[in-house]
Amino acid sequence: RYLVFSSDRRQQRRIFLYDLSQRKLLPLPGLNQPRVFYDQPDISRNGRYLVYTSEQEGKTDVFFYDRQTFQSRNLTKTYVGQVRNPTVSGDGRWIAFEGDRTGQWDIEVIDRGVQPDLIESE
């Protein structure tokens, strides 16, 4: 039902959410702040949760956005290394992304169960 994508529309990299059944772009309050780079979005099955990368303060991090509360949360603030290509599970509980803290790209997983904890990949 939903399509999420990033675009350089209006000279700034932003995230857009398109409702395929209503055939229109939906608002994302709290996202797409001026002078902030947003990229690589993914959306949960029901369309409530988004994950994306954003470069703020010179570091790219993975963020989690709840469309019901309009809140974003930095999931990799203390992660040492680069991150890319986040994805969210259908129910919004699990977030996976590529990270290079070991010197090579590995898959890292965050369980949002109670508190997001970083689970190290094997």
What are the residue ranges of the model-derived segments?
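Blade-level signature of beta-propeller repeat domains, shared across WD40, Kelch, NHL, RCC1
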Residues: 93-122
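Multi-bladed beta-propeller domains
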Residues: 20-38, 65-82, 111-122
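Beta-strand-rich domains and repeat architectures in extracellular enzymes and scaffolds
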Residues: 1-7
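A flexible loop/linker signature enriched in serine peptidases of the S9 family
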Residues: 7-16, 32-35, 53-63, 77-80, ...
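Repeat-blade elements of multi-bladed beta-propeller folds
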Residues: 1, 44-45
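Residue-level detector of Asp-centered blade-edge/turn motifs that repeat once per structural unit
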Residues: 45-46, 90-91
